[in-house]
UniProtKB/Swiss-Prot annotation:
Nitrilase that hydrolyzes preferentially fumaronitrile, while 3-phenylpropionitrile, beta-cyano-L-alanine and 4-cyanopyridine are transformed at much lower rates. It holds the Pfam family CN_hydrolase. The gene is nit. It comes from Trametes versicolor (strain FP-101664). The active site is at E46, K133, C178. This is Arylacetonitrilase. Belongs to the carbon-nitrogen hydrolase superfamily. Nitrilase family.
């Protein structure tokens, strides 16, 4: 059991598009994961920084765009962060002070385009990389650009063993955002790079999401850490769109959560957490990855490279 680390998944919402308040919340929840559960890795939801504009229309119908929608986009874009930026510096500070590796969903602003991004922050190295969501889903395409093949990192990371202090645990981790998880070739790429800790920031609180996460854990023989937002009307600005405008209630649930940690053999180690903000944690035995690959390695002994060919088309690197 020397090959273990402690990981936490945070289920929470953006603080009403307030960057300072959201960063304070990130610090509070990271410290909770560390102090209560001994977390070495903490995964936060999709769009935790910048916010997920659930129910927003941005003044759009096919063939027309309203001025109020443009104003809403301005407000949303101003809540996004650049990379690098003082916000990234603050996350680096939180990571360093808590000694927790942080994976967090952000809305990234690059000139006039927004991206749904996951950033990786190391307690020793600071910001180390990012992944931009390849395909925003449905109306998300109105506000977010598409990532490309230059931001698909699978990171090598060493942790001190949680069960044998002084020993080192070497692992590989990645992040796949929300419905990207339904892209078989993207999953195949991450499996081919040896991901062992598969982070899945999301806002999908549907029951079927649990089946998706279990499937990926089994298919990839990896730990799946899915962090979903839990959000209520009070977590959004007062004039934000809601499902039923005639029955506004600050406690109405907008995003119900469902954060979960699943082992490479499909066992639920923590969660799913529903209808509440919180932190779930588990001790991950990285040897379970090899135990799983004994009978299934979809890009190794269970692949047929003589029948199928897989290739990543990697463009020039984007701005950091």
């Amino acid at each position: 059991m020397a090959n273990t680390i402690k990981a936490s998944v945070v289920q929470a919402s953006t603080a009403a598009y307030s960057l300072p308040d959201t960063l304070d919340k990130l610090e509070k929840l990271t410290r909770l994961a560390k102090e209560r559960d001994g977390a070495q890795l903490a995964v936060f939801p999709e769009a935790f920084i910048g916010g997920y504009p659930k129910m927003s229309t941005f003044g759009l119908v096919v063939g027309d765009r309203q001025p109020e929608g443009r104003d809403e986009f301005v407000r949303y874009a101003k809540a996004a962060i650049e990379i690098p930026s003082p916000a990234i510096t603050r996350i680096e500070q939180i990571s360093r002070e808590t000694n927790v590796f942080i994976v967090v969903g952000v809305i990234e602003r690059d000139a006039g385009t927004l991206y749904c991004t996951a950033v990786f922050v190391d307690p020793e190295k600071g910001y180390v990389d990012k992944h931009r969501k390849l395909v925003p889903t449905a109306m998300e395409r109105v506000i977010w650009g598409q990532g490309d093949g230059s931001t698909l990192p699978v990171l090598d990371k060493s942790f001190e063993s949680a069960s044998a202090p002084g020993s080192t645990v070497n692992t590989k981790l990645s992040a796949t955002i929300c419905w990207e998880n339904y892209m078989p070739l993207l999953r195949t790429y991450y499996y081919s790079q040896g991901t062992q800790i598969y982070c899945a920031p999301t806002v999908d609180a549907r029951p079927a999401w649990q089946h998706t996460m279990t499937h990926i854990a089994l298919e990839g023989r990896c730990f799946v850490l899915s962090a979903c937002q839990f959000a209520q009307e009070k977590d959004y600005p007062p004039d934000h769109a809601v499902a039923n405008a005639s029955a506004r209630d600050p406690n109405n649930v907008m995003i119900a959560g469902g954060s979960v940690i699943i082992s490479p053999l499909g066992k639920v180690l923590a969660g799913p957490l529903l209808d509440a903000e919180g932190v779930i944690s588990a001790e991950l035995d990285l040897d379970d990855v090899l135990r799983g690959k004994f009978d299934l390695d979809v890009t190794g002994h269970y692949a047929r490279n003589d029948v199928f060919e897989f290739k990543l088309r990697e463009p020039p690197a984007t701005s950091s």
